[in-house]
Amino acid sequence: GFRLSKRWIGNGLLLLGAMIWGAAFVAQSVGMDYLEPFTFQASRCLLGAVVLLPVIAVMDRKGVSRRPVTREAKKKQLLYGFLCGVIIFAACSLQQCGLLYTTPGKSGFLTSLYIILVPLAGLLFGRRVKPWVWGSVVLALVGLYLLCGSTDFSLGAGELLTLGCAVAFCCHILVIDKITGQVDGVRLSCTQFFVCGCLSLICAFLWETPRWENILACWIPIGYAGIFSSGIGYTFQIIGQAYTEPTVASLLMSLESVFSVIFGWLILRQRLTPTELLGCLLVFSGVLLSQVPGKAPKLQESH
């Protein structure tokens, strides 16, 4: 029926978002050769916000956007955009700082722990999660563990910072889930990246030495990360989450790790080990299992 098709549209958008983010790992690793972390983050976020402005203008002209008309609605839109921008900034910055003290593999795995944090946090708010979705989460976690090749688990500064990043991403998913029906998705995405870009820019000027020539030398990775990963990928997340429950959304978004390995292999010619391949298969299986339609009601909330 119609409900199913809406769900598939939502899931499809989240899947596309995960693909776009997976390829962004390649752009980020190339970008880091030229730019310091906050400079790169500021460039991609501000570009992402700017790219969405003409989209908003066209949507307004065609009358397809959920434009806030009243002052109350405008205030709500700005407030939520600001909140999401601060959360995204915290998540990305914690991940970036964590990478100074831990390996990319561990960082990837610890970041993806949001897939277990989302249903756990949901329980606190009285949200029911279907039993097989828990199975999906466990399958995906085992897969991500294999994929990231993290063996020893000492908890140092890097690991704790990256766990903070996972908590921030979990908050972002839950906030989007809460507000998705109340605001225009593209406007929200644009506002959150403007906020995240400005905060990153302040940090760049405080702790780094941003140079125009370096930014221009890095235009391809910034262009991809800004236009596709920030501008398009996160907008897909916001729109997709309107039709998908948060735990399933987080599982679909965790495919980002699988795609990053695949694109690393395709573009950067990185080797794919049998263990990583098994990890990819387990994450895919977990996501497929989460798609089993069930009789459980769509998210019951207790107020």
Name what the model sees in each region.
Residues 19-20, 24-25, 53-111, 146, ...:
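Specific transmembrane alpha-helical segments of multi-pass solute transporters/efflux pumps
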Residues 38, 48-52, 118-119, 154-208, ...:
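Transmembrane alpha-helical segments that form core, pore/gating elements
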Residues 52, 129-149, 169, 200, ...:
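Hydrophobic transmembrane alpha-helices of multi-pass small-molecule transport proteins
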Residues 31, 40, 44, 98, ...:
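Hydrophobic/aromatic residues within transmembrane alpha-helices
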Residues 4, 44-46, 53, 57-61, ...:
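C-terminal-most transmembrane helix of multi-pass membrane proteins
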Residues 39-50, 96-127, 165, 246-265:
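Specific alpha-helical transmembrane segments that line the substrate/conduction pathway
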Residues 1-43, 86, 90, 94, ...:
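Glycine-/small-residue-enriched transmembrane alpha-helix faces in small-molecule transporters
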Residues 43, 107-113, 176-197, 230-266:
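Helix-helix packing/entry segments at the starts of transmembrane helices
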